[in-house]
């Protein structure tokens, strides 16, 4: 209404040509697509634009998406005040992940916004605990970094001792420790850590760091010299995947690397062995082995969370929802919460201590 009042245009917030009319009226510049020269408005462009009316368009889009994607979906799937989503154990025709993490559909409860400080809590506040309980959020602290350290210890890799010592002393932060070891800012250490864990290439990692190629190369060199165990582990797991075509997660689940590609650098479609042999000849290698560490760590994190859910179920404790490394459960009192934490922390045994952070409130939206 404010936009129409000031410009006389009844804007369709998802139609680029309609938004372009507003920009033209306000004498504002905007991008166009290369092929058709059609108006182009990205989310970041609209959100970061200095003009207040443009910010209102971005805000209206955000609210509309939250309503249609989440609120309407929640109402649609509500049954007697509860929602029973479909949970996908592994990758299949109807959803799921290749790493073994749970995914949800109809509705996708894991996508309910958390980072949006305004809309996220409002939508999450629709989720309430059982009567006379509080909503408890139990979150594995640094689940993936702990698993990296666990495997580095098992392989006796150089440089991991300092991290192990910190974890045994108490509330250690992996990214802080690595930043100190590598003598780089924490933000850069965290970006490199997560990039390596997730199998990110050097170019993408450089873009995430937001620095020049030369600066990125210096950072990588310094990181790998001072924190050698991460790259060593990544290389070891990649070699195992390349030689045997498989790796196993913490609790023994098999991750296969059954597709092949030519040895030479370039963009090639990964193919089954016989097809790749016919297409490219004998100079082929297994594809996607650069993702081996990611599959090992995420797959093992999934193992840990699922094992915790099984152990909780044995005690009659049923989570309402699982979101990555977090379980949300109706909690009776402090003693009940401590019991849940203890079960989760001891569901599997690692070479470093496990830690579960706990927060509670009257509903999901009041937490963080």
What do these predicted ranges mean?
Residues 226-227, 342-352:
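A common structural junction motif
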Residues 126-148, 160-194:
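Conserved catalytic alpha/beta cores of large enzymes that bind or transform nucleotide phosphates
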Residues 213, 332-337:
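Helix N-cap motif at beta-to-alpha junctions
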Residues 1-119, 128, 132-134, 141-144, ...:
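Conserved "right-hand" nucleotidyltransferase catalytic core of DNA-directed polymerases
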Residues 208, 328-332:
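Short hydrophobic/aromatic beta-strand micro-patches
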Residues 29-33, 153-170:
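Cytochrome P450 catalytic domain signature, combining two hallmark sequence patches
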Residues 20-27, 141-158, 331-334:
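Short active-site loop/helix that positions an aromatic residue
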Residues 28-29, 178-318, 358-368:
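Conserved catalytic core of nucleic-acid polymerases
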């Amino acid at each position: 209404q404010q936009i129409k009042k000031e410009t006389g245009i009844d804007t369709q917030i998802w139609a680029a040509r309609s938004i372009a009319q507003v920009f033209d009226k306000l004498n504002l510049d905007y991008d166009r697509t290369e092929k058709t020269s059609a108006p182009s408005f990205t989310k970041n462009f609209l959100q970061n634009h200095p003009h207040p009316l443009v910010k209102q368009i971005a805000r209206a889009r955000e609210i509309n998406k939250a309503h249609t994607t989440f609120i309407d979906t929640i109402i649609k799937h509500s049954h007697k005040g509860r929602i029973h989503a479909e949970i996908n154990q592994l990758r299949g025709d109807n959803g799921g992940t290749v790493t073994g993490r749970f995914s949800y559909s109809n509705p996708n409860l894991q996508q309910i916004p958390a980072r949006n400080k305004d809309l996220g809590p409002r939508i999450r506040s629709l989720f309430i605990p059982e009567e006379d309980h509080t909503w408890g959020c139990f979150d594995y602290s640094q689940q993936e970094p702990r698993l990296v350290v666990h495997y580095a210890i098992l392989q006796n890799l150089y440089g991991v001792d300092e991290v192990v010592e910190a974890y045994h002393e108490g509330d250690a932060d992996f990214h802080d420790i690595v930043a100190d070891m590598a003598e780089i800012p924490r933000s850069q250490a965290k970006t490199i850590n997560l990039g390596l864990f997730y199998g990110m290439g050097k170019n993408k990692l450089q873009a995430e760091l937001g620095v020049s190629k030369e600066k990125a190369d210096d950072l990588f060199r310094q990181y790998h010299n001072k924190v050698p165990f991460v790259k060593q582990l990544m290389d070891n797991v990649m070699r195992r995947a390349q030689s045997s075509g498989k790796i196993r997660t913490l609790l023994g689940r098999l991750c296969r690397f059954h597709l092949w590609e030519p040895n030479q650098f370039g963009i090639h479609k990964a193919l089954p062995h016989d097809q790749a042999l016919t297409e490219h000849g004998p100079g082929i290698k297994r594809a996607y082995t650069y993702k081996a560490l990611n599959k090992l760590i995420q797959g093992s994190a999934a193992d840990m969370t699922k094992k915790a859910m099984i152990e909780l179920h044995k005690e009659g404790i049923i989570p309402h929802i699982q979101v990555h490394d977090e379980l949300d459960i109706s909690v009776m009192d402090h003693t009940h919460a401590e019991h849940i934490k203890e079960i989760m922390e001891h569901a599997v045994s690692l070479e470093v201590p496990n830690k579960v952070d706990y927060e509670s409130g009257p509903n999901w939206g009041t937490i963080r």
